[in-house]
């Protein structure tokens, strides 16, 4: 069992041999790459020699996606389009920040923003691209720029990928309410790998994160207000949405 780790401060990528580390009671690490820039907004290890990176443009108005490494190929058109998103000069670049993860099953990447109402799914080989919008229309970045920061929406938190589907925590509250006293219970939205909605799990606790034990068909959520974890039987939902 291995884990590839990106050091945010140095840009170095190392591979940790987890089993050897446990057996030897020390970190067993191998340097895979020492030439990536520090401070990347996103990093995904595609392989031991190819890395998906998202880096700020020099003027801090865009976040540029690219592949780095020995055998990195050309970018598909979908990434070029995503790289066109930008904020105005001196505006908050985090408006277009996303959390990106890649499925090892189908090699599709999901990018979940924290302040926009749409999520992008795409493959690096260019054979699939889709945008999932939770709302009547896509958020306009320029309109969000014009709002005071406290009035901007906190849309999603936590992104989890599974074999047959993926999910996010939907917050949907403005930042002031979220920071000073949440009022709306969040929900967990589940989608298949083509972006089709599968289920909405409505919660009665103020959670920011979740995970699903697929073997025991159990949903785990963490309540940020009382530092407690809760478990729910998810067998009925999973029996409907998971292929045998």
Task: Report each predicted region and the residues it spans.
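Short, conserved, GDST-rich strand-edge loop motifs in beta-rich repeat architectures
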Residues: 48-58, 164, 168-184, 229-234
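Structural signature of eukaryotic scaffold interfaces centered on beta-propeller domains
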Residues: 31-48, 92-107, 112, 151-162, ...
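Beta-propeller blade signature
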Residues: 3-10, 60-71, 181-196, 236
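Asp-box/WD-like beta-propeller blade repeats and closely related beta-sheet repeat scaffolds
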Residues: 2, 6-53
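Short loop/turn segments immediately following beta-strands, especially the blade-tip
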Residues: 5-13, 19, 66-75, 123-134, ...
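Surface-exposed loop and turn segments in beta-propeller and other repeat-based domains
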Residues: 15-35, 71-96, 125, 129-151, ...
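Blade-level signature of beta-propeller repeat domains, shared across WD40, Kelch, NHL, RCC1
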Residues: 211-244
């Amino acid at each position: 069992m291995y884990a590839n780790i990106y050091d945010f401060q140095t840009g170095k990528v190392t591979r940790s041999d987890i089993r050897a580390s446990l057996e030897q009671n020390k970190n067993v690490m191998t340097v895979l790459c020492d030439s990536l820039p520090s401070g990347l907004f996103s990093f995904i290890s595609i392989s031991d020699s190819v890395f998906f990176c998202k880096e700020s443009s020099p003027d801090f108005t865009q976040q540029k996606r690219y592949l780095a490494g020995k055998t990195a190929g050309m970018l598909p058109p979908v990434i070029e389009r995503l790289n066109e998103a930008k904020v105005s000069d001196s505006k908050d670049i985090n408006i277009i920040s996303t959390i990106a993860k890649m499925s090892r099953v189908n090699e599709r990447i999901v990018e979940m923003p924290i302040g926009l109402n749409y999520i992008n799914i795409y493959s690096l080989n260019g054979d699939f691209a889709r945008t999932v919008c939770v709302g009547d229309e896509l958020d306009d970045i320029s309109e969000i720029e014009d709002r005071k920061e406290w009035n901007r929406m906190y849309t999603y938190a936590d992104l989890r990928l599974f074999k047959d589907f993926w999910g996010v925590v939907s917050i949907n509250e403005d930042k002031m309410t979220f920071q000073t006293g949440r009022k709306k219970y969040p929900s967990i939205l589940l989608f298949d790998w083509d972006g089709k909605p599968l289920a909405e799990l409505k919660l009665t606790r103020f959670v920011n994160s979740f995970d699903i034990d697929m073997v025991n068909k159990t949903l785990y959520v963490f309540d940020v207000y009382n530092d407690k974890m809760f478990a729910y039987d998810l067998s009925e939902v999973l029996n409907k949405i998971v292929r045998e």
